[in-house]
Amino acid sequence: MSLNKFKNLPLRLGVGIVLLNSENKVFVGKRIDNPVNLWQMPQGGVDKGEKLKQAALRELEEETGINKVKIVGEIENWLEYELPKNLLGKIWKGEYRGQKQKWFIMKFLGENKEINIKTKNPEFLDWKWVKPSELPNIAVDFKIQIYKKIANELCTTELN
C-alpha cells in the first residue's frame, strides 16, 4: 500500500488514562514491544457499543490490574496522532493511520502493591510514577505533542 492510500485510512477511536497518585504523579509503563527507554500512559481502543468511560476503565484494568480509581476529569478536547511511516499498515491490522483519543483523568485509590503489569496480555515491562512535566520527555516521538497538551492541562487544572 502506498503512503497515499494510508492517508485515506480512518483514525482509530481510543481512550487514554492519566492516572494520578496521591502526590499527583502520573502512572507510565515501559512498553514490552519497544526496546528503547520510552514510556506511555495506559490507553487503548473502544469496543463497538462501549461507552468511553467504560472503555477507559476496562483498558486501565487490562493493562495494569488497577480498578480502584475515581474519574476526576477529562482532557478538554479529543487528541489525535498519526502513526509514523514505519508503523503504518503494521499495527491494528493495517486498518488505521493513527488514533483519535478521549483522555480521562483518574485518581488511584489503591496501593502500589496492587498494580499488576503481568496481565493476561501484558503491554508493559515496567512502570513508575512521574511528574506531569516529565511526560513529553519520555514519550515516543509521535505522541510528544499529545503528552505536552496533557502535561499543560494538568498544570492548569485543580485536581482533587
Residue ranges and their predicted role:
Residues 34-37:
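A conserved beta-turn-beta hairpin within the catalytic core of GNAT-like acetyltransferases
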Residues 47-141:
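Unchanged
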Residues 132-160:
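Charged phosphate-binding loop/patch that engages nucleotide di/tri-phosphates or the phosphate backbone
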Residues 1-20, 93-94:
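Acidic, metal-coordinating catalytic segment for phosphate/diphosphate chemistry
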Residues 40-41:
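A short gly/proline-enriched turn/hairpin at secondary-structure junctions
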